[in-house]
């Protein structure tokens, strides 16, 4: 709810995008067939924290055309730092793509243009990522947590 309220208060698209992406993830990956929301998804798979979400530039270029890869890498920062407390070090050459909000603010066609350009690119990357070993899902459905999701 925090990102929704931040967007409503500031009108900054980076908060809107964050909220949209969270809801997309939740509805796609941690929602029960009957509509309940699962508790969580683990961070690690195959013995490495975050492995499911890590990419290399080579992987990006192997999946996308040159123009698509250049566009994706211009919008998404290469975040290879381990700023989250307790997170394992990310192996050399791997990174977690993090949207650079200023790249959207600077885009000529704004937020709508960004989503149009990224839709096909993200689908291609998602299809490849879905072939990886997924982290374990905690499929408990807790009433209080579900109430918060419904409120959001």
Segments and roles (model prediction):
Residues 1-152:
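Glycan-recognition and catalytic cores of secretory/periplasmic carbohydrate-active enzymes
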